């Protein structure tokens, strides 16, 4: 079992707590190192609940889950979301990275019933250009994603944070501008623009010359 790193919260005042309930990702996004090992390893749920309760008992302002795709396992996501709803202290906020198009009706119903500010969702879109999405091996149903984003907004209780990546294959200024306009039109609480990082060991790194990508040879490899 992984050691719990937050037994002593001294020094973490006004800082975000980063937390993992799983490792790995079942998807194959070509820019991501998690795509190399397609296995997802879930931590023991009783340990996860015990550690989350520690954060709740200490009124931690924010816990940021860094699971690559938090909702890739439906039962795992539902159990954690039910727990934090049932044990809500009225203070702590939980941040999750999710694939919006994978969210099921029962998940949407559950999160839609939560206290405003209990959770926030980061939704990776990266691009709306179909050729780019195919080339980076990303699985995404854009029409469904848009539906889910709007449904979440209708409850007015969850901060939505949508992501785009600039510099992806088959993306030029015109297609990126279209991606930006499409996502901006969804009116998320926050739209984050990141730049492609070509990480050693990734599919993107192995094929960078084919894409004619220019990037830094030192961190952050942008």
Language-model region placement:
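Conserved C-terminal portion of the radical SAM core fold
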Residues: 56-66, 91-97, 112-127, 139-221
């Amino acid at each position: 079992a992984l050691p719990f790193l937050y037994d002593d919260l001294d020094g973490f005042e006004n800082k975000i707590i980063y937390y993992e309930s799983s490792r790995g990702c079942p998807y194959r996004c070509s820019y991501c190192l998690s795509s190399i090992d397609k296995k997802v390893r879930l931590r023991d749920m009783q340990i996860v609940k015990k550690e989350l309760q520690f954060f709740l008992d200490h009124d931690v302002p924010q816990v940021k889950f860094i699971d690559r795709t938090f909702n890739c396992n439906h039962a795992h996501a539902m159990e954690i979301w039910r727990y934090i709803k049932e044990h809500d202290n009225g203070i702590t906020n939980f941040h999750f990275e999710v694939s919006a198009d994978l969210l099921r009706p029962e998940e949407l119903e559950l999160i839609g019933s939560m206290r405003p500010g209990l959770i926030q969702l980061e939704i990776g879109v990266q691009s709306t250009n179909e050729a780019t999405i195919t080339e980076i091996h990303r699985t995404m149903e854009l029409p469904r994603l848009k539906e889910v984003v709007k449904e979440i907004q209708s409850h007015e209780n969850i901060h939505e944070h949508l992501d785009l990546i600039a510099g992806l294959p088959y993306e030029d200024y015109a297609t990126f501008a279209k991606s930006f306009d499409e996502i901006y039109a969804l009116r998320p609480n926050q739209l984050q623009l990141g730049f492609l990082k070509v990480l050693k060991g990734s599919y993107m790194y192995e094929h960078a010359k084919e894409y004619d990508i220019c990037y830094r040879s030192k961190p952050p490899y942008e």
